[in-house]
């Protein structure tokens, strides 16, 4: 931690908090539930060092530069593709893996044709040896993140530990990370615990496992976005479905698109479309003149609500299996024209930041 602090400067500035070397962890949160769980992860996976992601642009910039130096990311021609970098995945790791994705609950009756079920204790006994010392020689990144707007009573908080800078940078693109997420959580124990380790990218020991009753997600031996960006399908659909069942709301792999004409009239279209057809693009587009709004909507007591956990940035397309482009741009960029739909299951995304 201290070594990393020297690399990024002796002092950090984070939303009005001045952080000295060596005290970053306690400065980010005093939530004992979070601190105890992260300590448990450190003892299990034994990383050489642990870095807490505070969400500051300076820290993220330093991580990008580190990834360039190690080859985890490659900076592309900045004249032709300004703000773009390239990330490679293994050739055997370019899609979600249905046969290795499990829902583990205590009730065997939860087993059905739509999921792979296993008893939680049996699954943990299988996976714990894979996680043992898996981060030795590596850095553990702790990513507090919020799904939904900060301050919204509908938003949900998660914390993901990972050994991948690619995961850190993409979670910043797709969610609200750092101090603001921890402030949303406060002292609560109501957060999703996500543990990811690339390990050896061994397809025979690749697992993406949800434990709804524990509010936990375990992912190992993958570097592909859908398997390792745990706020996506793992949390926003699988864990959230259980949360919604318990709390009286729904999580759906759908969209409700509001289209507003120049006169201000809004019509809504519902769409239950499969993966890789472009559901996200309309919701993430910010044309020069606003023509549409997208998000999850509902009606309660005569009032309409919506919440889209994705924000700020949207995916378009690049063309090489096993590769991803990550576009770095202004957090305040708004006028972005949509391109072709992203193929989410093929292992490559092009991300552009927008407000």
Kindly give the residue locations of the regions a language model identified.
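Short, Lys/Arg-enriched N-terminal segments with co-localized hydrophobic residues
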Residues: 3-7, 11-25
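Short loop/turn segments at connectors of secondary-structure elements within structured domains
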Residues: 8, 13, 265, 278-279
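Conserved internal helical-beta-strand scaffold that buttresses enzyme catalytic cores
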Residues: 19-277, 287-299, 306-355
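Hydrophobic positions on the alpha1 helix immediately C-terminal to the Walker A/P-loop
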Residues: 282
């Amino acid at each position: 931690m201290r070594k990393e602090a020297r690399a990024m400067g002796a002092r950090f500035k984070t939303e009005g908090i001045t952080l000295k070397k060596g005290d970053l962890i306690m400065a980010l949160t005093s939530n004992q539930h979070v601190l105890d769980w992260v300590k448990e992860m450190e003892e299990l996976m034994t990383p050489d060092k642990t870095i807490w992601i505070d969400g500051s642009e300076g820290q993220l910039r330093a991580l990008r530069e580190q990834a360039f130096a190690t080859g985890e990311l490659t900076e592309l021609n900045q004249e032709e593709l300004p703000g773009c970098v390239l990330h490679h995945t293994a050739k055997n790791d370019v899609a979600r893996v249905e046969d290795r994705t499990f829902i583990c609950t205590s009730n065997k009756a939860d087993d059905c044709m739509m999921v792979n079920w296993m008893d939680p204790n049996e699954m943990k006994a299988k996976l714990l040896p894979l996680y043992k010392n898996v981060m030795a020689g590596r850095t553990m990144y702790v990513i507090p993140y919020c799904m939904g707007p900060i301050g919204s009573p509908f938003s949900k908080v998660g914390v993901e530990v990972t050994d991948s800078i690619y995961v850190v940078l993409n979670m910043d693109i797709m969610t609200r990370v750092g101090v603001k997420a921890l402030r949303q959580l406060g002292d609560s124990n109501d957060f999703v615990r996500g543990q990811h380790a690339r390990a050896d990218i061994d397809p025979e020991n690749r697992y993406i496992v949800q434990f709804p009753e524990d509010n936990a997600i375990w992912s190992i031996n993958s570097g592909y976005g859908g398997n390792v960006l745990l706020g996506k399908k793992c949390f926003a659909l699988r864990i959230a479905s259980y949360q919604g069942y318990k709390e009286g709301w729904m999580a759906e792999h759908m969209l409700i698109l509001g289209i507003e004409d120049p006169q201000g009239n809004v019509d809504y279209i519902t769409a239950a479309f499969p993966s890789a057809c472009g559901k996200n693009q309309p919701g993430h587009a910010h044309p020069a003149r606003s023509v549409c709004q997208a998000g999850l909507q509902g009606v309660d007591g005569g009032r309409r609500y919506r919440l889209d956990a994705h924000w700020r940035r949207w995916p378009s397309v690049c063309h090489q299996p096993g590769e991803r482009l990550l576009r770095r741009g202004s957090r305040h960029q708004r006028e972005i024209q949509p391109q072709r739909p992203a193929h989410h299951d093929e292992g490559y995304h092009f991300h552009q930041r927008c407000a």
